[in-house]
Amino acid sequence: MRVAQVVRNTSETQISVKIDLDGTGRQKLATGVPFLDHMLDQIARHGLVDLDIEAHGDTHIDDHHTVEDVGITLGQAVAKAVGDRKGIRRYGHSYVPLDEALSRVVIDFSGRPGLEFHVPFTRARIGTFDVDLSIEFFRGFVNHAGVTLHIDNLRGVNAHHQLETVFKAFGRALRMAVELDERAAGQIPSTKGSL
């Protein structure tokens, strides 16, 4: 079973993440940031990973620390659940539309953190959620999961649709990348022999 639990406690946030990479999309989400919960639900459902995330943060200031630290802790949990990366497909990609919006996400479990985030948001907020926090979420994730991640919103007018397609595509790309390839069982997916 590829499961992991990570707890992160700082002076700003207290976060617990449990993940099962071979789940069915079940989720229990309580971050204190409703729109973030909605986006994390997309990862669980479209990535077919089970997620249990609880966060308490200094949201009386703003949502920045909570959103970023959930990304960090989720990245740590994914890295722990994937382990030595033997037998995984390593690469994943997905295109996801939602009405007028279309996004592409490509991920590489390379061991080299990197983020290319290109989303020309059409507004600064979705309800009370600051769209800039999505960058902080994914930056925290890649730095602690050890992945390279390319995110491109190819078109979109509605900012909610833009970001929802990003999170759905991320879930599907993650699912593809961590899937076990029976033809490569026990092998590191690299000609170098390590990641």
Swiss-Prot record:
It is an enzyme of class 4 (lyase). GO terms for molecular function: imidazoleglycerol-phosphate dehydratase activity. The keyword Lyase applies. One of its GO terms (cellular component) is cytoplasm. Its EC number is 4.2.1.19. Keywords: Amino-acid biosynthesis, Cytoplasm, Histidine biosynthesis, Lyase. The keyword Amino-acid biosynthesis applies. InterPro entries: IGPD_sf (IPR038494), ImidazoleglycerolP_deHydtase (IPR000807), ImidazoleglycerP_deHydtase_CS (IPR020565), Ribosomal_Su5_D2-typ_SF (IPR020568). It is found in: Cytoplasm. GO terms for biological process: L-histidine biosynthetic process. Its main location: cytoplasm. Pathway: Amino-acid biosynthesis; L-histidine biosynthesis; L-histidine from 5-phospho-alpha-D-ribose 1-diphosphate: step 6/9. It comes from the Bacteria. CDD domains: IGPD. It catalyses: D-erythro-1-(imidazol-4-yl)glycerol 3-phosphate = 3-(imidazol-4-yl)-2-oxopropyl phosphate + H2O. Belongs to the imidazoleglycerol-phosphate dehydratase family. This is Imidazoleglycerol-phosphate dehydratase. It comes from Burkholderia mallei (strain ATCC 23344). The gene is hisB.
